[in-house]
């Protein structure tokens, strides 16, 4: 374990003492340090009437147990404090460490002992994470240090788990959205599942906008998958134009219906454990699936501003600007009189995507988005540089396939009977509009691009993204983060995993940092918390995070690619083509082993290379036909320790998100030997060599120059490392599988790689 403590808020001695005393630690500024230390330690064992017993099982020095030390005349030193603090945090001498001071350095222990400031040290110790992944104070509260009295209690600017999760209110309401997406003449109703504590004051909300949450139709999804095999068709030269997105919600009027209490409840809904963490701390949890999902009405419009409006309507209802009904009969309205109107949105992938879309509406009441692995442009999810490009791991998927998956109204037989015929008509229109034949950007995709609306965002923004996420690729967060107004509070966590959550990792106190931020923004706590702009996981060291100022370096380093002409064949023999089509992972494995059709250029680095941004290939090439796909990957090549893609479980159920509530596993990305690592990659239709909106001819067998930006990343390579450039045509995971007999020839002497770095000019 290594500490990267973002969430602790430095405080005054007076505040620290007051907060310790409020928790029952009977310390005083006038006490001798050792006396305060003893009082603090005995309070930790509040379950014991005889606190001598647990103290006797800890050690203070190599010669004295802790009980004997406290009774002795020995002074409280840094060595004693550190050794005892480590044990309090769950580290075991002779098991986890032997040399205390060496271990303190190794784990980056965040507390610097000062006998004159011991109470501040103890205050920070309570706010420091244990080996198990929870802070010491959260561990104590989970054991019953404070009662579940449904009132807010704070420590170091963060809410504690004092809301009763054994007696929660669960209710369903139906919010009226200013939409008629299924064209039935009635405004769409949006089902909202609410879980909230029995609080006596108005409370904020965590909202997860998840089109998956009311169920998914995997059968329809699988039937809709598109065939990847086919020929890349040459396109007529032209300049693509689009109009600004012009979504207009329908008019609504305040309801005059009588107000009633909730008429529908539920017992269980799958939850997100970060929401559970906040539920125990006095935040309502709302799960909303939006238009076209089971329990709601409307059509699944998949990513456009109509879908986003269906989630926005819920925030409007929480603020008294929209109507919610107790049932589909629409005979009673229900008020959110328990809400303080402030909302934070959470969730990964599609869920985080809806957070970004919501933020671009500028809706009042949306205080914070915590968007993980979020899409900012749906074109960049299903297309890339003029090519149909399946998201990593899902060849054949497209937006109409996702519509089939998430249109969960068809899981209700009555809805299927009444509405499926019309749904199929609307789905057919969607399939045509997305234009899978050309792969071009068009109005359909522009209406699902949130980047042009980024200047409307006014809430606090937190993004997390994996730099090995080839599902929602890093360009998604790179573009939106760099499009945000400078006036915003914006924050980005970049890790080296794939499409994963990171709130339960051992090496970083993400949950606690979000607690401090949300208490500041949604509960009026003037806690002085400041979250860094960019927090990046160092790829060269285990469990190490660094603060950065920018995603995208201003310096460039030009790297030559060689002096030869190289030929890349597109065509495979029938057996290999079928084998790769059946298992794209076999293709990837053989590509990295040098067995596929490819050109490989190995570059031995003569100095450190701190990559930050979009690597760019400047190439001179020609195609034997009037078409061509170019795919590229940059590898950190050669055996050494690197991160794995998926977090591994360190300890099951070690994280308690409340008081014996919603336990989850502690995880961390493994750091182990590997033969290579993908640094970045990309695919390009050569007809789009001058940009996404420009289609050009490819003259047969004539040299052309291309500019090819790969996915952005932040990745540091060291002097002596090998940077491998892999160039090929068809990518069996992502692109159309065109087996036509053409070849690309590259003039390496007239080509080079341009690497953005975070070096100073």
Swiss-Prot record:
GO BP term, example: proteolysis
InterPro entries per record: AB_hydrolase_fold (IPR029058), Galactose-bd-like_sf (IPR008979), Pept_S15_Xpro (IPR008252), PepX_N_dom (IPR015251), PepX_N_dom_sf (IPR036313), Xaa-Pro-like_dom (IPR000383), Xaa-Pro_dipept_C (IPR013736), Xaa-Pro_dipeptidyl-ppase/CocE (IPR050585)
Catalytic class of the enzyme: hydrolase
GO cellular component: cytoplasm
Chemical reaction(s) catalysed: Hydrolyzes Xaa-Pro-|- bonds to release unblocked, N-terminal dipeptides from substrates including Ala-Pro-|-p-nitroanilide and (sequentially) Tyr-Pro-|-Phe-Pro-|-Gly-Pro-|-Ile
Gene Ontology terms for molecular function: aminopeptidase activity; dipeptidyl-peptidase activity; serine-type peptidase activity
NCBIfam families: PRK05371.1-4
Transmembrane segments: none
Subunit and interaction comment: Homodimer.
Main location (coarse class): cytoplasm
Active site: 349 (charge relay system), 469 (charge relay system), 499 (charge relay system)
Pfam families named in the record: Peptidase_S15, PepX_C, PepX_N
Keywords for this protein: Aminopeptidase, Cytoplasm, Hydrolase, Protease, Serine protease
Top-rank lineage group of the source organism: Bacteria
Organism: Streptococcus equi subsp. zooepidemicus (strain H70)
Function: Removes N-terminal dipeptides sequentially from polypeptides having unsubstituted N-termini provided that the penultimate residue is proline.
Record gene name: pepX
Family statement drawn from the similarity comment of this UniProt entry: Belongs to the peptidase S15 family.
Keyword Cytoplasm appears in the UniProt entry: yes
Protein's name in the database: Xaa-Pro dipeptidyl-peptidase
